[in-house]
Amino acid sequence: MSGRPRTTSFAESCKPVQQPSAFGSMKVSRDKDGSKVTTVVATPGQGPDRPQEVSYTDTKVIGNGSFGVVYQAKLCDSGELVAIKKVLQDKRFKNRELQIMRKLDHCNIVRLRYFFYSSGEKKDVVYLNLVLDYVPETVYRVARHYSRAKQTLPVIYVKLYMYQLFRSLAYIHSFGICHRDIKPQNLLLDPDTAVLKLCDFGSAKQLVRGEPNVSYICSRYYRAPELIFGATDYTSSIDVWSAGCVLAELLLGQPIFPGDSGVDQLVEIIKVLGTPTREQIREMNPNYTEFKFPQIKAHPWTKVFRPRTPPEAIALCSRLLEYTPTARLTPLEACAHSFFDELRDPNVKLPNGRDTPALFNFTTQELSSNPPLATILIPPHARIQAAASTPTNATAASDANAGDRGQTNNAAFASASNST
């Protein structure tokens, strides 16, 4: 494989990108303590394109891969930590990850604060730098900690993490955006507050029915069977399959479908779900004609998991890990599943005694795929709290343009109240 950093996905059929006039403008100075301060001209992630100077310091590498490099830095004006994802930019096209992230504003999705371009060491090499929320942990590292201690993640955390993941998916799917790389490594966590944020939209794409997509997408262990069958007209339900794999992994303490190749992966899936029927294969990929699998019966889900696994967790898994893409629950339906009922209890707390993070501040955008589900998703105590905090007419206008992040959408609460 080439050592050249992989670019993130690019939007097709785009005109060449015009770089901002301040492109490549990067100044380095020293603060009073002698620390290196970098000042760039950056554009805010949301809102109008109004470039502004942003200064940061204490830069250090915290991750790298085929996509590029991720740095941690501290903003000089606020002292907040941020992550800066630096990726190779093809100047001929708009960067799809940037285009998608500028649309998104949700409490369970990592926020794009700014972006800026920088020059490479070689002539004509350009980098896109995404300045993102810094979140200290990942579901992958937390789960690995428990696994190494021969323990499983406490079920309350499984509920909190999966619920927030499904909320983030319901939100992006409402825009027709498919993440295409759901895995524990891409689920950021604040261990103190239990807030989860979905990150890394480098593989994400707005899916359009009838337009082909690459099937070699998504990380192994989490690839939906239709991708293994080579489907190119798949839907956002591939994210739901991946989320089901994450749920199963948190319950088991190890991946449910490990495999070093597509064939290995399929064998592992068949061991649990049984051999897919011809109809199921047709639903996954109508063009797939090879059918040479041994006939294996499905393994009972109750025997896949440990004896003390909550029945509701097993039931939810079985509704996510379905061969037929249309048979899988939608993310919003998953949020409404009885496995998450404990989170809707007004007295539930985190194990550390803190309140749970915001779980019911649904927006009309989030609920758009199935508005009646608001009656389940927004419990009575949350509706009462929302009604008590409803802004007066004088302040409502000023709040009208507030984003989704952490904002209580009173229209959503009202619809829930009216439906009950």
Curated annotation (Swiss-Prot):
Q: What are the EC numbers?
A: 2.7.11.26, 2.7.11.1
Active-site residues?
D181 (proton acceptor)
Low complexity compositional bias, start-end: 387-401, 409-420
What residues bear Phosphoserine in this entry?
S9, S389
Q: Where is the Protein kinase domain?
A: 56-340
What keywords sit in the KW lines? ADP-ribosylation, ATP-binding, Biological rhythms, Carbohydrate metabolism, Cell membrane, Cytoplasm, Developmental protein, Differentiation, Glycogen metabolism, Kinase, Lipoprotein, Membrane, Neurogenesis, Nucleotide-binding, Nucleus, Palmitate, Phosphoprotein, Serine/threonine-protein kinase, Signal transduction inhibitor, Transferase, Wnt signaling pathway
- Activity regulation, per record: Activated by phosphorylation at Tyr-216. In response to insulin, inhibited by phosphorylation at Ser-9 by PKB/AKT1; phosphorylation at this site causes a conformational change, preventing access of substrates to the active site. Inhibited by IL22 treatment which also triggers phosphorylation at Ser-9, promoting inactivation. Inhibited by lithium.
Q: Which Pfam families match?
A: Pkinase
- Residues found modified as Phosphotyrosine: Y216
Q: Gene3D superfamilies attached here?
A: Phosphorylase Kinase, domain 1 (3.30.200.20), Transferase(Phosphotransferase) domain 1 (1.10.510.10)
Q: How is it modified after translation?
A: Phosphorylated by AKT1 and ILK1. Upon insulin-mediated signaling, the activated PKB/AKT1 and RPS6KA3 protein kinases phosphorylate and deactivate GSK3B, resulting in the dephosphorylation and activation of GYS1. Activated by phosphorylation at Tyr-216. Inactivated by phosphorylation at Ser-9. Mono-ADP-ribosylation by PARP10 negatively regulates kinase activity.
Give the residue numbers of the S-palmitoyl cysteine lipid attachment. C14
Asked if the Swiss-Prot or TrEMBL record annotates the protein with the keyword Membrane, the reply is yes
Q: Where is the composition biased (Polar residues)?
A: 1-22
Tell me what reaction this enzyme catalyses. L-seryl-[tau protein] + ATP = O-phospho-L-seryl-[tau protein] + ADP + H(+); L-threonyl-[tau protein] + ATP = O-phospho-L-threonyl-[tau protein] + ADP + H(+); L-seryl-[protein] + ATP = O-phospho-L-seryl-[protein] + ADP + H(+); L-threonyl-[protein] + ATP = O-phospho-L-threonyl-[protein] + ADP + H(+)
Broad EC category: transferase
According to the UniProt entry, which residues carry Phosphothreonine?
Answer: T390
Q: How does it assemble?
A: Monomer. Interacts with DAB2IP (via C2 domain); the interaction stimulates GSK3B kinase activation. Interacts (via C2 domain) with PPP2CA. Interacts with ARRB2, AXIN1, CABYR, DISC1, MMP2, MUC1, NIN, PRUNE1 and ZBED3. Interacts with AXIN1; the interaction mediates hyperphosphorylation of CTNNB1 leading to its ubiquitination and destruction. Interacts with and phosphorylates SNAI1. Interacts with DNM1L (via a C-terminal domain). Found in a complex composed of MACF1, APC, AXIN1, CTNNB1 and GSK3B. Interacts with SGK3. Interacts with the CLOCK-BMAL1 heterodimer. Interacts with the BMAL1.
The role this protein plays is: Constitutively active protein kinase that acts as a negative regulator in the hormonal control of glucose homeostasis, Wnt signaling and regulation of transcription factors and microtubules, by phosphorylating and inactivating glycogen synthase (GYS1 or GYS2), EIF2B, CTNNB1/beta-catenin, APC, AXIN1, DPYSL2/CRMP2, JUN, NFATC1/NFATC, MAPT/TAU and MACF1. Requires primed phosphorylation of the majority of its substrates. In skeletal muscle, contributes to insulin regulation of glycogen synthesis by phosphorylating and inhibiting GYS1 activity and hence glycogen synthesis.
| Official protein name in the record | Glycogen synthase kinase-3 beta
Name the species this protein comes from. Answer: Spermophilus citellus (European ground squirrel)
Report which gene this protein is encoded by.
GSK3B
